[in-house]
Amino acid sequence: MDRRLLEILACPICKGKLVYSQDEQELICRFDKLAYPIHDGIPVMLPDSTRPLIER
């Protein structure tokens, strides 16, 4: 994930910062506890494409 791209992307729901998870290939919104998938290097930022984060 390009660092410059990560700096300008925001959660489409709360407009908060996203964190890149290299292991899962996802962008994480910690506020909403949602994960946005990355397919072939392209973040899928559609609210319907999210998965809820499970607290560990």
Swiss-Prot record:
SUPFAM superfamilies: Trm112p-like. Disulfide bonds: none annotated. GO terms for cellular component: cytosol. It comes from the Bacteria. InterPro entries: Trm112-like. Belongs to the UPF0434 family. This is UPF0434 protein CbuK_1382. It comes from Coxiella burnetii (strain CbuK_Q154). The lineage of its organism: Bacteria, Pseudomonadati, Pseudomonadota, Gammaproteobacteria, Legionellales.
